[in-house]
């Protein structure tokens, strides 16, 4: 394999932005045979590499996987925790999981002598970090060619975004996160970083630290900023239609929202939780 040393060691690479917290690499004594892949992002790359984990996290509805992946045993992993005893029962020799679980479960994995490769995921990760993570995973578990292939796929997306931006007029935009008036997202959030590649000026960047990501907001600020278009996302709404029902009920109950051009003109884009 591309990431394997002559001694039989297996070298897993971290993306640059995680080097400070995790180091540049995770070195295993040998190629792992029983991987518990508790990250959908990592699972997409492992599936492309033809690697079959012994257990996986619940599959994201928005991600596409080969048929065989849907036959694998699953364990629920999320912000509320995970069933670590069930994971131990599969006797993994490597666990891949989001770094947000490290504080709670890292020591238990260490005590059990199970190496852990942490991935970065959630609303605070940017497009660029997502790209770096995918390439690092491909370097670690695939081949140099596969890493180059994935890098080229991201480059193609960026080229399409640049062409779209060059041919469309810019619009004043806000991202409403969770529910109307609860949170806003700057250009450093996951969705915000992708929309920053398109012809949108994120008004939240002008009233809060752009590096803040997803931060609290109030209705008065949104009304004052008066975006031409609003992108709505929520971790609790599986589909855009679910989210539309929540938002439109709130918009109808609070006439003040009609002062915003985007609301008044029906220019609100409701996205599924895959964009969170």
Predicted regions and their residues:
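Bacterial Sec-exported substrate-binding components of ABC uptake systems
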Residues: 1-41, 144-175, 234
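A short, structured surface patch at a secondary-structure boundary
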Residues: 36-90, 94, 203
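Alpha-helical, coiled-coil/dimerization segments enriched in small aliphatic residues
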Residues: 60-65, 184-213
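Proline-aspartate-enriched helix->loop->beta-strand connector
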Residues: 74, 84-97, 114, 219-232
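Extracytoplasmic ligand-binding site segments that recognize negatively charged/polar headgroups
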Residues: 104, 117-136, 170-194, 238
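Structured C-terminal subdomain patch of bacterial secreted/periplasmic proteins
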Residues: 128-142, 148-149, 162, 232-276
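Ligand-binding pocket segment of bilobal, Venus flytrap-like solute-binding proteins
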Residues: 194, 212-239
């Amino acid at each position: 394999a591309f990431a394997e040393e002559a001694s039989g060691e297996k070298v897993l690479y971290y993306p640059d932005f995680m080097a400070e917290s995790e180091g540049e690499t995770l070195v295993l004594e040998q190629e792992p045979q029983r991987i518990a892949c508790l990250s959908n992002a990592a699972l997409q790359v492992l599936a492309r590499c033809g690697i079959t984990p012994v257990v996986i996290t619940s599959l994201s509805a928005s991600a596409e996987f080969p048929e065989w992946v849907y036959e694998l045993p699953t364990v629920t992993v999320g912000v509320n925790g995970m069933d670590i005893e069930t994971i131990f029962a599969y006797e993994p020799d490597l666990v891949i999981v989001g770094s947000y679980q490290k504080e709670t479960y890292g020591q238990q994995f260490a005590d059990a002598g199970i190496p852990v490769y942490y991935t970065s995921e959630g609303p605070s990760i940017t497009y660029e970090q997502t790209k770096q993570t995918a390439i690092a995973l491909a370097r670690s578990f695939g081949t140099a060619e596969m890493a180059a292939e994935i890098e080229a796929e991201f480059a193609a997306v960026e080229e399409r975004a640049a062409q779209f931006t060059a041919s469309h007029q810019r619009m004043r935009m806000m991202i409403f996160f969770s529910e109307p008036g609860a949170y806003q997202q700057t250009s450093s959030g996951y969705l915000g970083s992708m929309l920053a590649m398109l012809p949108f000026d994120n008004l939240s960047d002008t009233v809060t630290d752009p590096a803040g990501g997803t931060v609290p907001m109030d209705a008065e600020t949104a009304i004052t900023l008066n975006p031409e278009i609003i992108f709505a996302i929520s971790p609790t709404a599986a589909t855009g239609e679910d989210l539309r029902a929540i938002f439109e009920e709130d918009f109808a109950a609070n006439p003040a929202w009609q002062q915003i051009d985007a609301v008044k003109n029906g220019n609100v884009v409701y996205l599924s939780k895959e964009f969170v």
